[in-house]
């Protein structure tokens, strides 16, 4: 340790004497494996990571529960990825740099369900990435042994993992219905019956099934998702509140009034907008129906429209 420090001071001293930029000294020092950082064998990497919240409870097909508490890793180029089913996904840079990146790519959150099938495990609320949190979707695929087979980043800070396991090779291994308590199965039966009897629409059917999966604990309710969604930024506010709707409506009404004014001013007849589709009619067809000469001699109208 003392020798290392002496060497560090020597290197700093040398670089201070020469014209080398500050970065040069840094580069030399990091070649030495050091005792301060991530690679300290006495300080396990994982203990340095601070999870934002606890993972969701273990849920889904019972035969997968035995994976809970285990971890599977994959080294790809300079990173080691680690998937701990029903717990987390982490990433560890494999270098001797003192500030090697180690991070949480997601904490077990909820299942993805499609077509009566568990199609993926969502791990969310990972380390910050710009204004969002890193998140990972883990697909379960049939394989000879348990292994993390593939990792990619299809969009920024959203990771896609493939985990192979013999536990999902049976064609019914990931079906949702058999995992449900009987009461929820009866509810599901009723929902299907109502759809068949056309008492509910396909959209209503989707919505009822979603609620049912939330009750089972497979999906999180929108309130439970809120922290993640809010991190999506101001854009995600949209029409969520009545206040926003009123504002948007007021602005659209003003715009319609302005456009109508333009049409009137130029003697172009228009139909009263009763539906949104009429806006298009107003914008394109009516002027086209007029003699083209009138429009051509009127650049002001075209520019404004
Ligand atoms: C990830 O999950 C594993 C397995 O349960 C656990 O030992 C580890 O502490 C977790 N890591 C983080 C950063 O929460
Ligand atoms: C839905 O799942 C069934 C098996 O459960 C399968 O036969 C069918 O092809 C799937 N449909 C779609 C659209 O994925």
From Swiss-Prot:
Residues 281-296 have a biased composition (Basic and acidic residues). Pfam families: PRKCSH. The keyword Plastid does not apply. Disulfide bonds join 71-84, 129-157, 142-169. Widely expressed. Glycans are attached at residues 88, 115. One of its GO terms (biological process) is N-glycan processing to lysosome. InterPro entries: DMAP1-bd (IPR010506), Gtb1-like (IPR039794), Man6P_isomerase_rcpt-bd_dom_sf (IPR009011), MRH_dom (IPR044865), OS9-like_dom (IPR012913). It is found in: Secreted; Golgi apparatus. It comes from the Eukaryota. Keywords: Disease variant, Disulfide bond, Glycoprotein, Golgi apparatus, Mucolipidosis, Secreted, Signal. SUPFAM superfamilies: Mannose 6-phosphate receptor domain. Changing residue 286 to M: Does not affect localization to Golgi apparatus. Homodimer; disulfide-linked. Hexamer of two alpha (GNPTAB), two beta (GNPTAB) and two gamma (GNPTG) subunits; disulfide-linked. The alpha and/or the beta subunits of the enzyme constitute the catalytic subunits. This is N-acetylglucosamine-1-phosphotransferase subunit gamma. It comes from Homo sapiens.
